[in-house]
Amino acid sequence: MTTSAAKETQPYRTLSRREFLRLSALASAGVIIGCAVNPVTGEKQFMLVSQDWEVQIDQENAPYQFSADYGATQDQDLNRYINQVGSTIAAGTHRPQMPYSFRCVNATYINAYAFPGGSIAATRGIMLSLESEAALAALLGHELGHVNARHTARQMSKSMLTQAIIAGVSIYAASKDELYGDIASAIGMIGAGALLASYSRDNEREADYLGMQYMTQSGYGTKGFVELMAMLNSLHQGSPDAVSLLFATHPMSSERYQTAVRLAETEFADAESQPLYRERYMDNTASLRKIKPAIELFQKGDELTAGKKFGDAETALARGLKIAPNDYAGLVIMSKCKLAQGKHNEALQFSAKAGQVYPQEAQADYISGYCSLQLNRLDAAVADFTAYEKKLPGNPNTRFYRGLAYEKMGRKQEAAADYTAFLHQVNQGEEAQHAYNQLVKWGFIKPDTQAR
């Protein structure tokens, strides 16, 4: 779901007005202002984004996406396994020097994604859909293909010269989150798909080819890639909500599956007999598969909440939490379901427990802060938003809501500091107008010192 509020408040690295105007002027004059060698093809291509900038973009945005997906799983053995498989493949790519990292995130929907600096994640949902280490290698190889072909950087380079957005060009597509889009927008959270790049069909074809190349040269059989494409093609034909975000960012078609089969039988035929490591995959994902029924119920609760079928959603989520009572994602999803119904006290109970289960993760703090604010528990709201800001700094909405809590407490100095910080990042919308009006009212700024 795309909202103007989401666009205005996401913590993207953007061009300054001066940078944008300079680039636009050079482009209109026909000047070649950026050229780099494609690390995959060896050919020169138009490129305005340096490798250092790719890494910076990654570092600034990936943490928000991982938090939106309920953080990296607390199963350290599973994360080590995924990172080991991914790192082995990454060593043989066209850009082995990139700071790659791999993890499984707690999200229940089916997806995997990469940020331009090499931060790569697979959701619990897609991990449960794979049946071999070779299929996992294919999945990670595909995402590595996007990083090595610099697909996001190429999109950014085009956007910098073609989008007339003087305030700056956002790196990634606006939120495509169909689940909780309204809730995320209403309380100022980052939606699940807000920071993910959307790839073209040509991007997907190139990443598929590179993925097969990378995984086979790492010793995996081509059947793993064909398995992955067959699974995705089957899901695409069914089009359940659990994969809506996956196919919004990674266009799927039967052509991709057919191409995988053809490549496996021709160009990569020598790798057909290489191992798939099914048993090794099953052994390393045993703890995850043990709670598969709970994860599926959490996903069902997601979908039902999105459809505003709250009673059925609560039933599904309660069943899931009976199986996995300390599942962070399940607790937060239930909290969101309660929040969507205006049940702030009940929502707070679940978000507070989630915070206890996974104290390093920030999303539960944000929800707890918002619920406490609605319940007029102002000290608690300040504490929760402060905890969130320490774990995941940079979301302007955190500063706005904490400022609002301070305002209600009569602590104008602290409120003014937060409102000022908020206005440095956001200058449109009801929240921005409220912050501005209060700063004027309290005498911190003069009405004519800042254009509204």
Residue spans for each PLM region:
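Extracytoplasmic and endomembrane cell-envelope/extracellular-matrix remodeling and assembly machinery
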Residues: 45, 50, 195, 201-329, ...
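Canonical positions in the second alpha-helix
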Residues: 320, 353-354, 387-388, 421-422
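N-terminal secretory signal peptides
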Residues: 1-19, 26-33
